[in-house]
Amino acid sequence: MEKVSFPVANTQLVGDLYGAAESGCRPAVAIIGPMTYQKEQAPTEYAKRLADQGFVALVYDSRYRGESGGEPRAWENPMHKVDDLKAAVAYLKSRDDVDPTRVSVLAICQGSSVAFRAAAERDDVHALATIAGHYRDQEGDIEWLTEAGYAARKAQGEAAKAKFEATGTVDYIKGVDQTDMNVGMPGDFVWEWYQPWADRGLWENQYAVMSDADLLSYESISAAKQLTSPWLMIHGDNCFLPGAARRHMDAVPASTKTKTVWDETPHLAYYDQAEVIDNATQQVVEWFRSA
């Protein structure tokens, strides 16, 4: 593994690069993870496997998280994540050991909605694969949070952002909690997965409240309508918001090459279950090679 860094908007992003070639050029993959992710979580599991298959694989912390710079910390800003991912693609294309015509993007959970916009705005992404995607449209957001919850969170986020812009003060809540629903990612099952990372000091259980002003103003279905990069979707009825996944697939232009792998695998199994990750990685490898 090689520790790397690259700039975006006067901020340094820090990443881990797997599979660097000693000679020649290899295909490469920029990997983005779920909401509030840090690179050592699910993205690294996929990066190691992709490197074993001959890819240069980059995982990185988005701005405001992990080893990467940016203030305020724990600010979840999807549009900034779009720019971060585009910068990661550009970094890979600049490397001597990477074939610049074969740089693809792999996205996990809510990273998928970011990847759509990044791929739509950069028409040189070789191929896109999304795993257990959290696809963003208002219908899905209301299904996720309820109509009242969506409105309350957005209003709370907008008030917190106005406070930050006026005073520089950042209001924080937890990222996850076992019982408290006023957190960035509510739900006991989410807490069960993330809290052990926090207990080991490998993930910060913190969420800037003003994030919701940006997060809940973001959608990805308009980007799906512009997608030209070949797209592999791995999803299923036991993954998050399957209806939103179907709406995004339906929105993609008919001229865009697509493939759907739909099964009964539980959403969080794609984060840490070795056999599930092995199988998903093989699907991704075959897709990127054939695109």
How should each PLM-predicted stretch be described?
Residues 49-69:
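Conserved alpha/beta-hydrolase
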Residues 39, 65-100, 274-279:
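Catalytic nucleophile-loop/oxyanion-hole region of alpha/beta-hydrolase
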Residues 97-109:
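Alpha/beta-hydrolase fold nucleophile elbow
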Residues 116-196:
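Alpha/beta-hydrolase-fold enzymes
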Residues 1-24:
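N-terminal cap/lid segment of alpha/beta-hydrolase-fold proteins
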Residues 263-291:
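Catalytic active-site module of serine/aspartate enzymes centered on a nucleophile-bearing elbow/loop
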Residues 227, 233-235:
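Short beta-strand/loop motif that positions the catalytic acidic residue
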Residues 35-48, 62, 244-245:
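The serine-hydrolase catalytic nucleophile loop
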